[in-house]
Amino acid sequence: TDKLGDLVTRSAAEGLTFKMQSDQQDMALEYQFSQSAASKVGTAVAPAAQKPGNSIFLPAKEVLSLFPIILKSREVDRSFGFDDTYYDLVKALQIAPSRGKNFSAFADAREELSHVVDGKVDFDDNSGKWYYKNSSGQKFSIGATAEGVKKISIMDRLLANGYLSKDSVIFIDELESALHPTAICKFLDMLAQVSKEMGIQVFISTHSYFVIKKMYLIALKQPEAVTCISLSRG
């Protein structure tokens, strides 16, 4: 999108307005902007106190292939091409994995993810590029790596470098995108594990009945409720 106002429905008589009220005092979030908004929100009210854990948004499209482009557009060109959620994600991915300081739940989750992608994605500091290394030790450029592998590897990196912690919040758009059914199941099992053991809250948007069904099966196995919100027209 060229400007923020493009997010407003063309036929809408008024601008876009959002308001969310928490059950805690002074924890309301509200903002609004019109079709003419370029890059700034017109009115915004945010909580004074921030959550202790980091929050991150994982888009449907992986960002490893666009990594240098996103950084350059924001830090060099100063252009409005990628919103802050993309910029925040690539900045979080820049953090190198920490050794010996990770939670056991994260280590177990990373082990499961490594089996799904049959290897791992890492960053080469010398070349400044991402690469995929399979379990046989073969290296591949990130451009020649499957979309699903890159998507899962983003989560692996965030678990490894300490960006995610207890009470973090993860927003995932179209989790099923570029993933085969087995990978979807493993990914959701991993999210359920870290959510249960670490208190991480996960919000998932999906168009897939398969994802909803898997979440239903997960909910049957654990006492914690899995909330599902269905949106429809009319």
Give a label for each model feature.
Residues 1, 131-234:
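Switch/communication elements of ASCE P-loop NTPase nucleotide-binding domains
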Residues 1-167, 234:
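Phosphate-coordinating catalytic segments in nucleotide- and nucleic-acid-processing enzymes
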